[in-house]
Swiss-Prot record:
This is Mitochondrial import inner membrane translocase subunit TIM16. Keywords: Membrane, Mitochondrion, Mitochondrion inner membrane, Protein transport, Translocation, Transport. The gene is PAM16. It comes from Debaryomyces hansenii (strain ATCC 36239 / CBS 767 / BCRC 21394 / JCM 1990 / NBRC 0083 / IGC 2968) (Yeast). One of its GO terms (molecular function) is protein domain specific binding. Belongs to the TIM16/PAM16 family.
Length: 128
């Protein structure tokens, strides 16, 4: 009798777990399919830190973003948060990844601008 009850509990649990797993998989697949792929509206850079967060870490604005400003803020914050001065490696790594993320974002935007300018130049009016 106990053997039959134990087998029944195991099969019922496996059935419930199987249904929950398939439902979770369906939801994850639907969520993945509905997310936008890349483009200028992407919120994360190639490095993984969202661009907005990287701007906040380095205290920069999107309007005055340049490699020189990124390098200036990075050098200052990396030095201030050095382990030799009693600060943490964690903060230094956040500053580094923010700088890396913003540089990759600038490279991406430059490439996008160049391809856009190149395609507009080719599609211009032709004179014969």
């Amino acid at each position: 009798m106990a053997h039959r009850l134990l087998v029944n509990v195991i099969f019922t649990g496996a059935s419930v777990f199987g249904r929950a797993f398939t439902e979770a998989y369906k939801q994850a697949a639907k969520a993945t399919a509905s997310t936008p792929q890349g483009g200028a509206a992407k919120s994360t850079s190639v490095g993984g830190i969202p661009t907005d967060e990287a701007l906040k870490i380095l205290d920069l604005k999107k309007t005055d973003l340049s490699v020189a400003k990124i390098d200036e803020k990075y050098a200052y914050l990396f030095d201030v948060n050095s382990k030799d001065k009693g600060n943490s490696f964690y903060l230094q790594s956040k500053v580094y990844y923010a700088m890396d993320s913003l540089r990759k974002e600038l490279d991406y935007l430059d490439k996008l601008k160049k391809t856009k300018d190149g395609s507009q130049g080719e599609a211009g009016p032709t004179s014969t």
